[in-house]
Amino acid sequence: MMLRKKTKQLISSILILVLLLSLFPTALAAEGNTREDNFKHLLGNDNVKRPSEAGALQLQEVDGQMTLVDQHGEKIQLRGMSTHGLQWFPEILNDNAYKALANDWESNMIRLAMYVGENGYASNPELIKSRVIKGIDLAIENDMYVIVDWHVHAPGDPRDPVYAGAEDFFRDIAALYPNNPHIIYELANEPSSNNNGGAGIPNNEEGWNAVKEYADPIVEMLRDSGNADDNIIIVGSPNWSQRPDLAADNPIDDHHTMYTVHFYTGSHAASTESYPPETPNSERGNVMSNTRYALENGVAVFATEWGTSQANGDGGPYFDEADVWIEFLNENNISWANWSLTNKNEVSGAFTPFELGKSNATSLDPGPDQVWVPEELSLSGEYVRARIKGVNYEPIDRTKYTKVLWDFNDGTKQGFGVNGDSPVEDVVIENEAGALKLSGLDASNDVSEGNYWANARLSADGWGKSVDILGAEKLTMDVIVDEPTTVSIAAIPQGPSANWVNPNRAIKVEPTNFVPLEDKFKAELTITSADSPSLEAIAMHAENNNINNIILFVGTEGADVIYLDNIKVIGTEVEIPVVHDPKGEAVLPSVFEDGTRQGWDWAGESGVKTALTIEEANGSNALSWEFGYPEVKPSDNWATAPRLDFWKSDLVRGENDYVTFDFYLDPVRATEGAMNINLVFQPPTNGYWVQAPKTYTINFDELEEPNQVNGLYHYEVKINVRDITNIQDDTLLRNMMIIFADVESDFAGRVFVDNVRFEGAATTEPVEPEPVDPGEETPPVDEKEAKTEQKEAEKEEKEE
């Protein structure tokens, strides 16, 4: 009770602060300065030329530095975006998206990230290749260069058998597009020590020699084929393409080969200098310095992937650091592609992701207008768009929102009628052409500020809906008339927290406020919370912010008929703090009997971040949360998934074979689809990702009563970790994630997790039963009681 009271007080304080802040405009930067004023190369894009102008690309030495030039020998810089994995996000391959990137973003390049492992090309070569071909064709049609990226990622050795199809793939693409100047071939995205699914390579000259051993024959094949005589080829470098310096020490013998640098501004610091002569490669540790070294030693560099987050895709965004990096790239005419064109819930994604109760995922098809509006872009996407265009970064105010309450587009009155207490009764209300038509207003003609009581009243008693308007500051509506006139409206929004609060005044629109609208005239009428205290009472209430009705007092000056449309609220988003139970220390097995979460938290990419609390399930404490899968499904079913994360410094598999836990469901709705439970570890030695190959599936259309325990559906989840073959028993796993993915389901409700633990293989040796006195009745085993007793004993041991 005390926690709930404190939470209410905190929410009330936040609401008051929001109201106060809304009274003052956002302060402009001091003296009108912008962040770009401190740099020389962030603004402008004169060198960002299109294929129709620049033609075939080539490498030349300009001002003592190898760089990319156009067919005329003039500098050219490619700026654009990389797709995410085409096996996961193929929806970006559409003409509307490409036109948005080419025209609105002013990109002159796109990178097609064709993963080979991780269910990519090696698993389904024909399908994935067809997507690459579609992406190439769209780029050519939209006058953009296109990087065909053979996305070496997991495993990190490009010589691994999973990548055996590289030479054939590039031969086929070159044959389809012989000597096409639009196409750039990227042979190895990120060679690294990542041994997830195969071998990795070291971060030294031995690692570069491995990359070179792989790349040399492909470069030779492309040149000898007659289909890629002069196309630019890009080759990755060790340590996730952070070592172009190693390539500069021993470059590939080819006239048009460049080398990659990849960086993430939250992980890779800038540097103003290279290295002293004769610095051993083992002492070259800064990514920007490695790039400077490569340029100084005669090779050309291309930043084919960079992000505004940390290297794992989360944290940030780090825009100040990004400005320093982009300044460096632009100053040195280094082309760049940002990661990535995805609505995945990661900071580096360009589009708004799905987050439960907060946002829906932006469609990767922007629609026929071929523009993603700023609200559809993530913070990173909005920033990168400005940097591609070379314009000032002016972020929108993302705290403002608009919610349409009544739009009348369905052809109905949406619950509106003449209010029972209206002093003017002969008003006819109907839907005409998608607006609410009010007729018979001749007798409702007081347009003064305070005498609205004499006017006609209408209300939405039959609406039957409820909308949360937390933080609302204004109520607006379109007033449509045959001829400009004066219309006066007062409003009483209603909801559980405010049934009736008299308006302070009526608000009017006058003839000069109207503008032509086809054969009529339209004005927008705005009622503030100061005009309608009821609006403020609902919007700023600490517990209930729902509106479920509205009473409007309508007066006109000589107009018998008016129309109302698009009744909506405008306000400021209020971030209500999520109150979790204490995190506690990371403990495995996790039994939660100490009242803490024992180290469990939401992963950064989790699509659900509701309150994690300790609740009772089957007689003992369990980690619990509420959520629901959305009706409109994103393309990535992990985007909406709750992702539990558990970090422990000494976390290893040991001799265990399974991760097991008790999982309980208390559904409000669960009639179709399934929940797919995945297990992931993030060991640094394996590229921060290993995934159990098998999952645990709960089919919601097969929920059975026998699975119920004390009103909850109970599942003993067991996921095999012995099948993860590329880790050892003593591999430091760092952290464990449990991911509850949506499979076309309608689940909504509360879930519980308990007794999370490693477990060995089940013992199969028979156990001899003890003899039982025939005169005694053997009591049945109460599993619930036994489990509770076990936990109490464990708790007592800890206390001792």
UniProtKB/Swiss-Prot annotation:
- Catalyzes what? Endohydrolysis of (1->4)-beta-D-glucosidic linkages in cellulose, lichenin and cereal beta-D-glucans
Question: What other remark does the UniProt record contain for this protein?
Answer: Alkalophilic Bacillus sp strain 1139 is not a true cellulolytic microorganism because the enzyme is unable to hydrolyze native cellulose.
What is the protein's given name? Answer: Endoglucanase
Which residue ranges are recorded for the region named Disordered? 761-800
InterPro entries according to UniProt: CBM17/28, Galactose-bd-like_sf, Glyco_hydro_5, Glyco_hydro_5_CS, Glycoside_hydrolase_SF
What keywords would UniProt list here? Carbohydrate metabolism, Cellulose degradation, Glycosidase, Hydrolase, Polysaccharide degradation, Signal
Claim: ATP-binding is one of the keywords in the record? no
**One GO term of the biological process aspect:** cellulose catabolic process
The record's SUPFAM superfamilies line, in alphabetical order, gives: (Trans)glycosidases (SSF51445), Galactose-binding domain-like (SSF49785)
| EC number(s) reported in the record | 3.2.1.4
Signal peptide stretch = 1-30
Q: Does the keyword Signal apply?
A: yes
Which organism is this protein's natural source? Halalkalibacter akibai (strain ATCC 43226 / DSM 21942 / CIP 109018 / JCM 9157 / 1139)
| PROSITE patterns in UniProt | GLYCOSYL_HYDROL_F5 (PS00659)
UniProt family annotation: Belongs to the glycosyl hydrolase 5 (cellulase A) family.
User: How does changing the pH alter activity?
Assistant: Optimum pH is 9.0.
Q: Which residues form the active site?
A: E190, E305
